[in-house]
Amino acid sequence: MERGEQVAAKTDNLDTRLTIAAHHEAGHIVIAAAMGLRLRPEGIMVDKGAWGLACFYKEPDESDESKESIIVATFAGYLAQKRFCEERGYSCPLPDDLEVTLSPDSKEARGIETNLSKQYLGTRTVPEVHELLQQRAAELVLQHWPAIEAVAREVASTSLAPLKPLKSGTQWSDQTSARSLPGDEVVKIVERFGIKAVCVTES
């Protein structure tokens, strides 16, 4: 699965929305790399309508550690978007707004949370774990903010090019062009910030 659609930014300025989208997707992919998840060759794409995609391997194995990593990386997109908007004074949906709680990212994370083992949960409820993992994601976004900003800047500075199809064949955008940063380029950027990342092609 390669999906990282951001929560809609509350601005009519397209350039601003593109930059916000770049930070959302950078949040996903940088924290995915920091959590040891493998990146996909497609990397990051933000279409000309300011909707984006972060491509990393989201299929968890049976371990709770794998599920936790994917949940945290999934939360990180909105949290990076929120941090960027707050820094720049842009309006951003609040965590409890329906467009956040019902977003594709939130639904995806909650779906994985229901598959966490009883051993992992212990005496905690799923909602309690949800809050803890959101907090963990927020801490990682803060810790790796320089890397997130560097990746986002690189995405936002690229020129629009014809939209490339995903290797999976999934159509993620109805636009014809997008800004993109391949996975191997993401690896080079985050390594400058001490993150050991891996980009692999699915066999």
What are the language-model segments listed below?
Residues 2-203:
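Soluble catalytic regions of large protease machineries
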